[in-house]
């Protein structure tokens, strides 16, 4: 994607400011609303002949950024990403959630998160080895799904009552049928091959009411990755994400029974609508003991996900504390019951 925003004052490049929600010039300090920036200062095209592709030498990740960028840091592995061949394909998303957390705020939030690790090494908790923090828009498909559900079940309702000296149990048997229609809106599924699904799922939720019509200005100063999977390819994952919610709703419709034995369940889910969006993520590359650790932060909420290193000493001390506490509790119970140490 080729995008260039020139400052009306000094002609320098402008970037999206997550704190003010406007375009900001780092040279002269001018700020402009995205909608009010003069058109003659905007050069943006979705042309197959002009979009640039940057490919990381280390991990092979394919990144998209402004045309004037010649080198950057790979958000996936922290390595250098270089300009490669030109792209093909239409890369314009329908919606975007802009960054609301600045790079400085992201760094502060990450340092705070590091210090909360009860089982992480002290050297890691100091959070003084941040190699890079890169703002990146990750491609997602949003799905609006409709599920038609038919369920047949054998149910019982048991109640007891006294009759003279006897306690009687009465069991009623029912055949139950449920015909359910459910709608699920804006189910997100990440469309990046390089991003782990588990990592992206943990970054949720985003506030999807903040989705905005896509404008190229939101990408100024950030990296955007193209999608690797179509909505058709990701439809099975979208259905999988709502399966537990469907089961939970089915269960709620059988309240009041003592037992429920589902003997037949049919679920038909269709894709009512799907659209391509970009969601903000801060990728953090952190060096610790000659190893690089990659973390992701929700660029809207500040939620951090990733696997920090674990201190074996702290883990051993933690288990020793649990074992010691359990031993002491058992001895106290023994004393109260008349036993002794």
Swiss-Prot record:
It is a single-pass membrane protein. The keyword DNA-binding does not apply. Keywords: Cell membrane, Membrane, Transmembrane, Transmembrane helix. The chain crosses the membrane at residues 315-337. Gene3D superfamilies: RNA polymerase ii, chain L. GO terms for cellular component: plasma membrane. Coiled coil: none annotated. Its main location: membrane. It is found in: Cell membrane. The keyword Transmembrane applies. It comes from the Bacteria. InterPro entries: Znf_TFIIB. This is Uncharacterized protein YdjG. It comes from Bacillus subtilis (strain 168). The lineage of its organism: Bacteria, Bacillati, Bacillota, Bacilli, Bacillales.
């Amino acid at each position: 994607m080729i995008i260039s925003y020139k400052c009306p004052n000094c002609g320098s490049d402008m970037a999206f400011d997550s704190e003010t929600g406007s375009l900001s010039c780092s040279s002269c300090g001018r700020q402009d609303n995205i909608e009010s920036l003069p058109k003659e200062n905007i050069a943006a095209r979705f042309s197959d002949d002009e979009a640039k592709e940057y490919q990381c030498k280390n991990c092979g990740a394919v990144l998209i950024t402004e045309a004037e960028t010649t080198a950057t840091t790979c958000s996936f592995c922290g390595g250098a990403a270089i300009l490669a061949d030109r792209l093909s394909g239409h890369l314009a998303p329908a919606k975007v959630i802009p960054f609301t957390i600045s790079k400085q705020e992201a760094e502060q939030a990450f340092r705070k998160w590091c210090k909360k690790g009860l089982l992480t090494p002290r050297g890691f908790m100091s959070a003084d080895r941040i190699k890079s923090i890169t703002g990146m828009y990750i491609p997602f498909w949003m799905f609006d799904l409709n599920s038609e559900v038919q369920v047949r079940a054998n149910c019982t309702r048991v109640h007891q009552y006294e009759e003279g000296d006897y306690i009687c149990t009465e069991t009623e048997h029912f055949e139950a049928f449920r015909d359910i229609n459910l709608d699920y809106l804006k189910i997100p599924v990440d469309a990046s091959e390089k991003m782990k699904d588990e990592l992206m799922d943990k970054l949720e939720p985003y506030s999807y009411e903040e989705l905005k019509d896509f404008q190229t200005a939101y990408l100024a100063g950030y990296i955007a990755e193209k999608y690797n999977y179509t909505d058709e390819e990701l439809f099975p994952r979208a259905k999988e994400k709502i399966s537990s919610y469907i089961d939970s709703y089915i269960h709620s419709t059988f309240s009041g029974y003592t037992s429920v034995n589902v003997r037949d369940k049919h679920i038909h889910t269709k894709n009512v609508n799907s659209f391509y969006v970009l969601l903000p993520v801060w990728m953090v590359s952190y060096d610790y003991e000659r190893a690089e650790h990659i973390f992701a932060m929700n660029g809207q909420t500040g939620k951090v996900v990733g696997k920090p290193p674990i201190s074996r000493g702290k883990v051993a001390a933690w288990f020793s504390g649990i074992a010691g506490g359990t031993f002491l509790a058992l001895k106290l119970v023994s004393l109260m019951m008349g036993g002794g140490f």
